[in-house]
Curated annotation (Swiss-Prot):
Cystines in this chain: none
Native organism: Arabidopsis thaliana (Mouse-ear cress)
Location of the protein in the cell: Nucleus
Function: Required for fertility. Involved in chromatid cohesion establishment, in chromosome structure during male and female meiosis (e.g. the synapse formation between homologous chromosomes, the recombination, and the cohesion of both chromatid arm and centromere), and in axial element formation. Regulates the switch from mitosis to the reductional meiosis division of megaspores prior to the female gametogenesis (megasporogenesis).
Segments of skewed composition (Acidic residues): 227-237
Span of domain PI-PLC X-box: 351-498
Protein known as: Protein DYAD
Domain of life per record: Eukaryota
Gene giving rise to this polypeptide: DYAD
Amino acid sequence: MSSTMFVKRNPIRETTAGKISSPSSPTLNVAVAHIRAGSYYEIDASILPQRSPENLKSIRVVMVSKITASDVSLRYPSMFSLRSHFDYSRMNRNKPMKKRSGGGLLPVFDESHVMASELAGDLLYRRIAPHELSMNRNSWGFWVSSSSRRNKFPRREVVSQPAYNTRLCRAASPEGKCSSELKSGGMIKWGRRLRVQYQSRHIDTRKNKEGEESSRVKDEVYKEEEMEKEEDDDDGNEIGGTKQEAKEITNGNRKRKLIESSTERLAQKAKVYDQKKETQIVVYKRKSERKFIDRWSVERYKLAERNMLKVMKEKNAVFGNSILRPELRSEARKLIGDTGLLDHLLKHMAGKVAPGGQDRFMRKHNADGAMEYWLESSDLIHIRKEAGVKDPYWTPPPGWKLGDNPSQDPVCAGEIRDIREELASLKRELKKLASKKEEEELVIMTTPNSCVTSQNDNLMTPAKEIYADLLKKKYKIEDQLVIIGETLRKMEEDMGWLKKTVDENYPKKPDSTETPLLLEDSPPIQTLEGEVKVVNKGNQITESPQNREKGRKHDQQERSPLSLISNTGFRICRPVGMFAWPQLPALAAATDTNASSPSHRQAYPSPFPVKPLAAKRPLGLTFPFTIIPEEAPKNLFNV
């Protein structure tokens, strides 16, 4: 039925195709009979040969421009033409069709390709109607091929008849089927990669051994069969031809026996081979899995850490002598060639234990904002936790022990600790001595006089020595404590006296005029109250006998406890230069020098007048002078 239909439809296709070009052979006309020039067709890019243009492989719709007897010319838009077409349509989407300037309804078919008519018969498998073209002309998927887009159209169902016709033409073609298959690109050509299955060496060697053993077994069986056949032939020749029936029977029995024996031998050899195979132990060398830290191997990472530790130890980078990052990087660059690994270590090694487990890498920003690195003990983090220090960079000062206050000065803490230990040892020794003394008293009470005298001679000598040493130590410590207490008490008294003196003698009347004292042979000084006072040659101020009774009463009322305490053999003298606590040697030397030199007899006004407290009665006059000789002491208090 199909052949009759083919014969009836052929004249119509020949007439339509004859208007364009005159066919040279009926078989080629049948191959391109369903193709019309000027029409648009959808192509099957999967059957394109390898030498076809790349743009044609990505295009879905082409136009037939010319049909000849041997080939078909196609025109199709390039990707640049499609992009320009869609860009222009997107820009002028809101304009009416009449007002649009430039551009067209369809993209420009600026590419062309010529192919064989046999290939075109299969490639152009569906004709696109004009109304479908007008509806889908602004769709990108309509022009560009895609697997999802091609699956929507049933290709082979629509073109079953033309494809059948092309197959008939290929069958009737004088070139044969092979040439058409070669032209259609069915053969693998240069540039194609073939899949190769790789097997490891131990599998290949095992297969080779198995093949060699099986071939050896087969060769042995074959040789045995040949030997048996030769023996059978020799036996047959010797017997002769008189007994042919008996010979045939014997030959049949022999063949049966040979077959049975050969099968038994093969089975035995197979069993032995299987047993050997079961007992065989195959050892494979498996490569150990390489472990990585980030993107570097463990060996390489550990080597870089060791080199970094070596550089920091050479530079003595410890707490207080840290090394800056640029200097450390330049030195470590000589040993660590991978700069990426070097920068990674500089960034992430802070807080990690160095190789060896004794040191720890540390880093922080200094006051200038630069990064600095140093090494510290790996146990220091546990010491901080036990001491209760929250500062991650705290380092114990020298002399610090676990249990001391972290905020206290270690020198003071050490001295206080030593004093406490000495006092504790003294207390223990005193307790021992007291206990020994009690024991000795008990022994004296319990033993007779003769025994006591003999025992005392033996026991008292070392005890007396120990007791004497302890008493010496005790006296020394007590003397030191007494000296310290007296010094502190004198300092407190001097400070109170100085404060009281400044408060009492600070000038409240700046307009008052005071006359300076004279050094030697001065006339009597008349005070505001009419009291007369005389300056002796020894730089001492004395009062007239008329005012002594008044002074005594006034002294009893106004004399301070400090003046009572200071009522000693020392006398309050006129200060030389600066007011100081009197010292007899220094004061005598200063007095002699002042008395001998006439230049010192002139008095100078003092900006801070001080009125000293006398032993008997406080004077009402101030001494405004500031003579500071070089020999005078500089300290305010000389205890």
